[in-house]
């Protein structure tokens, strides 16, 4: 289940609670892209998506020193399993309740735009869940999906496809092999 709150009133307290409880009772993983003012609606969600600015804002609100401290405090407070932070040029970081922090750096030199970044990451995470991928591989897949968006020329006509993702992963793999030489 993917819950994405655009602040239009569709994801309200009662509805979110019902969806989350039903999904959890059937062991269906939940991915959420919450409004920072609606974090209370995400208690018990498996995967939460933030952009780096959101984590920085929460760090200040919580009065902690680092983004990592803020992430772990949010995970504990809201009973999340994972907090995925999308940082554009800095890549993707996944903070987890029971695992080490994983970071996948962005490999692009030319970032063109960020519209659709969270949606692309949510889809990548859903695919990773369906394939039982590790948190590390989930970070790599989410980062590849984000790089497809970050490198796209035109967002209004760009649709993230399986082929785009395969091509991006191939490029990332090639770059990694070349850098190890």
What do these predicted regions represent?
Residues 1-10:
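Short acidic, glycine-rich surface-loop motifs adjacent to enzyme active sites
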Residues 13-29, 34-44, 59-61, 65-181:
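Conserved phosphate-binding/catalytic region of the ribokinase-like
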Residues 56:
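Nucleotide phosphate-binding site architecture
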Residues 45-53:
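Non-cysteine beta-strand/loop elements that form the S-adenosyl-L-methionine
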Residues 6, 35-37, 53:
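Short, ordered loop/turn segments at secondary-structure junctions
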